[in-house]
Design a protein with these regions (language model features):
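TRNA-recognition modules of translation machinery and tRNA-sensing kinases, especially anticodon-binding
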Residues: 4-210
Length: 210
């Protein structure tokens, strides 16, 4: 899928409020009023739901772009992965089970998760997921600011009925969950990388570790 997308697919169809800060030019790269560099991979989900309907199960990944200031955990270009499941009788329990399975398969059986309430316009309810720090096993260390928890790992929630409706799916019959994660951030947690900029600096000695 192209890196450019319609403003409508990136925001309007995903139930983003008209005054949501992510719509601002300070957050999103605009070509013109209708075309932007995608700030998330969610427009792929919109296209898939509109073209294929429900039931649907999908994973998509790719580069996304946001007008972020560069620091140890932020980059104006990064990689995102999203998952979407829409079917009859899909519940929050299905979402939690799926993500717990992923975390334990990827980071290890000993890693615990914490689901916190959050707000995303395209899901309701919405949650953020943390994991116990992989450096100290949750005991508390400098890497996790002595909290025992790693940085926010991913966002997720039940697909908002308005999003289903916007994509031609009946929310009275179908429900679904979605999750999204920064691939670079996942790699940082797994491989104990302290600065996201290291991934984009073409440092051969660093890259050869992988």
């Amino acid at each position: 899928f192209p890196y450019t997308t319609l403003f409508r697919s990136n925001f309007d169809l995903l139930n983003a409020p008209k005054d949501h800060p992510s719509r601002d030019m300070s957050d999103t790269f605009y070509f013109d009023k209708n075309t932007i560099l995608r700030s998330q991979t969610s427009p792929v989900q919109v296209r898939a739901m509109k073209e294929h309907g429900a039931p649907i199960r999908m994973i998509c990944s790719g580069r996304v772009f946001r007008s972020d200031e560069v620091d140890a955990t932020h980059s104006p270009m990064f990689h995102q992965l999203e998952g979407l499941v829409v079917d009859e009788k899909i519940s929050v329990a299905n979402l939690i089970d799926t993500l717990n399975y992923f975390v334990k398969a990827f980071f290890g059986e000993e890693v615990k998760t914490r689901f916190r309430p959050h707000y995303f316009p395209f899901t309701e309810p919405s949650l953020e997921v943390d994991t116990t720090c992989t450096s100290c096993g949750g005991k508390g260390c400098k890497a996790c600011n002595y909290t025992g928890w790693s940085m926010e790992l991913l966002g997720c929630g039940m697909v908002h009925p308005n999003v289903l409706r916007n994509c031609g799916i009946d929310p009275e019959k179908y429900s679904g969950f979605a999750f999204g994660m920064g691939i670079d951030r996942i790699a940082m947690v797994r491989y104990k990388i302290t600065d996201i900029r290291m991934m984009f600096e073409n440092n051969k000695k660093f890259l050869e570790q992988f």
